Amino acid sequence: KSDGMPTYHFANVVDDHDMKITSVVRGEEWLSSLPSHVTLYNHFGWSPPKFYHLPLILKSTGQGKLSKRDAEEQGHPVFAVQWEESKGFKESGYTPEGILNYLALLGWKGKGDDEKYSLNELVKKFDSKDINKSGARFDIKKAVWINHLHLRDFSSKKILSLCDQANVLLGKKI
């Protein structure tokens, strides 16, 4: 930039190189920056990491990119935790296992009919060749259902622990 500060792209490439990043996973809206990043890597004589561009997460209608505003309009979270006025998934009662599972299925489909995955299963089964080419529609009913699949397998002790955490998070005492 004219003020002497490194631009985003320059800083991004240098930071990823210094941190020895081998794979970059980001949204398709960054696809247009790929040539600039590869050019910078080549200019410095560095091997670029592997780049994976995920499809956009679309509104529940399938039209347009999901945004923060959609949380207020449609009454469901779009962030992991509270962000300003909108409740996040955590405050809405989603488990880390359930929301991770649901988000992993947005834009990716493993082999077979399975829809419930643990983190370890996702790591084992993930193949970048299975990333969808088109945008993924955000379906809050499916997110609730997948979260339910995880909740029903939890022990009573874990359910009580989650309830305690929710009460603390919501500022309630029981």
Q: Model-flagged regions — what are they?
A:
Residues 1-53, 74:
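Divalent-metal (Mg2+/Mn2+/Ca2+)-assisted nucleotide/phosphate chemistry catalytic cores
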Residues 32, 43-174:
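Catalytic adenosine-cofactor/nucleotide-binding cores of aminoacyl-tRNA synthetases and other
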